[in-house]
Amino acid sequence: MAGVFPARTHIAKTVEHLFRLLPDVERVKTQVLLLSGSTTPFRNDTDRELALRQESNFFYLSGCDVANSHLLITARPPGHNPLANATTTSTGSSIHSTLFIPREDPLETMWSPPPPTLDEVRKTHDAHDLAYSDEFVSKVTSTLPQLGSATIHILPQTAQFPNVPATVLTQLAVAGLTPPPVITYLLPALHSARLIKTPYEIDLIREANAISSRAHEVIMRVLGKDMKEVGGKVNTRKADSAVMPGQWRIEKEAEAEAVFVASCRREGSVHQAYMPIVASAQHAATLHYCCNDRAFAWGPINADRRDLQVNRHEGHTHNGIANGHQDEPTLAPQVLLLDAGCEWRNYASDITRTTPVGNGGRFTSEARAIYQLVLKMQNEAIESLKPGLHWDAVQLQCHKTLVNGFLKLGIFKGDASAILDSEVSSAFYPHGVGHSLGLDVHDVPSASKPEPVTASGTLLALGPNVTTPVESIHHPSFYRYLRLRLPLVAGMVLTVEPGIYFSPHLLAPVRNSPFIDHEVLAKYESVGGVRIEDVLVITENGSENLTTVGKEVEWIERLSSGEV
């Protein structure tokens, strides 16, 4: 992505939301924002550095990935004398930012690369002024007396955020320059600003999705290459021999994770947006399964068997018996649910694909039926997306499609409306259809639901007329884990990720449901789980899918079987 990260644009958006949130008596004052970036992380009780990932709010306002940096933002309300060397927002406020980065420490340069110089940062960052981090305290305490009546805003001083240095807060208190810093408004203002993405941000998310889409395809192709060359038979390579990338096979969840991450890294992505979920067979029924430590189930095994078992520590089971003699083991029919996405310049992707493993690289009849139903849920949801549509309505439609699909498969029985009202579908589809995505994979939680309001009762960012659909009141379990509860607005970026799961934990409370044909259900439980997830941006007239990897059954099977 070319060009300088538009930090001033993001500061202006945040300041506009901040002034909207403030009580009337505070809006006439100058507002001062103090933020600190992430510090260099270390492994516990050692001097070994860990990978740095900048705190999202700090990066949003600075575009700075340098550890131990700080930010001072001053905003003067409309109608007041503008600040020197400042930017004027669309509402008439003047804003000025100073980015502080650490000096080079000659003693540290032997061990680690030095931070950029001020001259280098001036060419690559969108701040009004630059200074060194060791000047942060003096700059803050010298600036405030010049501003008159001012309110200082900081993020909550909790472990969730890098805290502003205590020396700054102490010096402010000693000097008696202002009332104590306020933590009420800055985070909601940031979340509201981040909810609607700029074209620059959307391009970063598009690139993250392109890289992750190719990595998902790599997984399918490696599985297919293995299926074509050795027919899914047990690997006989020696554990102590080097294996080149072109010889890699995927027989374990960890191997799939390794190939996915390697594919992203070789394309320049530094971080995964979240811990990959690599779940085979029944493990796919656990929504956030991040263990990724099991081998795939092995046979020989008939596709109709429901007792796919994997020893967690020993890996493969190589004792298949057929026709009274030892038979060469092959991969058992199962699915691999891979929910993984990388970041590009700290902006996330979030993609899930469910791929057949074993069975010649093709879905069993039961897995295919469930996959096609989930795909129908997702396609209908995507087709409905447009500004003004309430996200609750998308969630409800997914449940309706599931109910009708289960009736056709014979898993459900009875009247569709009665089944929907019973909320039994929540046992199979317990989570929300999607969430906001941006600098964080579960982005801006405080702005994704309608609770945060201004002092006058106006909903953040989206106006006063947002209401929850009446239908939502009648199906509370459908929305319990829905992370977005708003009408859609152009510029929102969100995931669409319905799924169907056969989790013993979730099914236990509905085992006696009169709406379930338990004999039919038993035939599908070995599927484990299926989820399909894409990232979309809401446009003026609909949506654009930023995820490019295929998801049609025929396309996936062609890759996973080695046909192409």
Kindly label every feature range from the protein language model:
Residues M1-V564:
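Active-site neighborhoods and metal-handling regions in enzymes and metal-associated proteins
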